[in-house]
């Protein structure tokens, strides 16, 4: 139900004329005491599968409308294959147009991580805070 709602919301934004949709924290919870959450039967062993399926669904629907699906990523989300969030470099490479970085993330380090995950031309598809935010922008 949640993915259906988010899909409908993203499509509505695309119909309003937005050319890029940026998702933030669009994976399984990864910060704090997530071990408590990991005991539920609803939490799959390999969280990359549902996260990748969710991104692929949105990316396909948005691409048909000429809209780029982007994701905000943090340093600890993509370096490995075993992450709590399910959002790895490989998942991002397969499904998103651009990756927006948190202010504390090294752009060069992240370019290498994403290239290893199969991200084509990561330098052109990464947005970092340095020089990206215009006057009055929320992105810093």
Label the predicted regions.
Residues 1-11:
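Active-site-adjacent "subsite" loops/lids of carbohydrate-active enzymes
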Residues 10-11, 51-59, 89, 111-115:
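Generic structural signal for well-ordered alpha-helices
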Residues 19-48:
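Active-site-proximal loop/short-helix segments
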Residues 22-24, 45-85, 100, 122-131:
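Aromatic-lined carbohydrate-recognition surfaces of secreted/lumenal glycan-active proteins
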Residues 30-33, 78-82, 108-112:
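Extracytoplasmic/secreted cell-surface and envelope-processing proteins
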Residues 90, 95-140:
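Substrate-binding cleft of secreted/luminal carbohydrate-active enzymes
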